[in-house]
């Protein structure tokens, strides 16, 4: 923090249009010991705004997009050099959730490589299993996190998950902020079934008498 160093990357990675999420974080994506950059972009260019219904109630604009980009570090952690960002894929197609992707890379299924969980502009979660390896990640198509055969959902929208072993039991939980500033724990059960890690439904953190609140659009960070 002694001096500012300008990154050789565009502020809006891969996009010149309207965005409402621009989420940067470090991760050693390919296990080479160097911290790469991943960027979640919420692209509203096709979607526009919420007034595009016609008289028949049909949506006339395009979809809302949520992409994940990787900028590999070809240098060192002390002197990083980032190559041009590329859009990550899963199941042979670009990862594209419903805006606000908030990407989290962690070993959610306990097999030694980094899987991916994304949030979205609405209230649910997408899981992308790493079916490659730690050094050569390859992601399967998205699956919804679920509990008792129903999708896990937050109470509100614009959710921001942060992966952390909250209870120090050896598996990776999620601490999630939502639109009104509340924060919830989604606890990993330690089990994986049918290739999908199993989580408990959200439990909102509380103060002595009410929900713990941090204003609007809470963005928790675990470390």
Question: Locations of the language-model features?
Answer:
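Beta-propeller-forming repeat regions
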Residues: 1-223
């Amino acid at each position: 923090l002694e001096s500012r160093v300008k990154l050789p990357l565009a502020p809006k990675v891969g996009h010149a249009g309207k965005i409402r999420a621009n989420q940067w974080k470090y991760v050693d994506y390919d296990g080479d010991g160097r911290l790469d950059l991943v960027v979640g972009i919420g692209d509203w260019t096709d979607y526009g705004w919420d007034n595009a219904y016609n008289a028949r109630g049909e949506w006339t604009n395009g979809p809302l997009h949520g992409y994940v980009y990787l900028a590999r570090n070809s240098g060192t952690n002390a002197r990083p050099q980032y190559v041009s960002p590329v859009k990550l894929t899963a199941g042979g197609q670009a990862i594209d959730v419903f805006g606000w992707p908030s990407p989290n890379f962690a070993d959610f299924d306990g097999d030694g490589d980094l899987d991916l969980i994304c949030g979205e502009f609405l209230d649910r979660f997408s899981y992308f299993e790493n079916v490659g390896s730690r050094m050569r990640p390859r992601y399967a198509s998205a699956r919804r996190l679920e509990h008792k055969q129903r999708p896990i959902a937050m109470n509100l929208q614009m959710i921001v998950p942060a992966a952390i072993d909250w209870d120090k039991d050896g598996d990776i939980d999620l601490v999630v902020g939502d639109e009104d500033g509340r924060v919830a724990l989604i606890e990993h059960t330690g089990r994986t079934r049918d290739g999908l890690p199993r989580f408990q439904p959200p439990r909102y953190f509380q103060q002595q008498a009410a929900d713990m609140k941090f204003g609007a659009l809470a963005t928790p960070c675990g470390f």
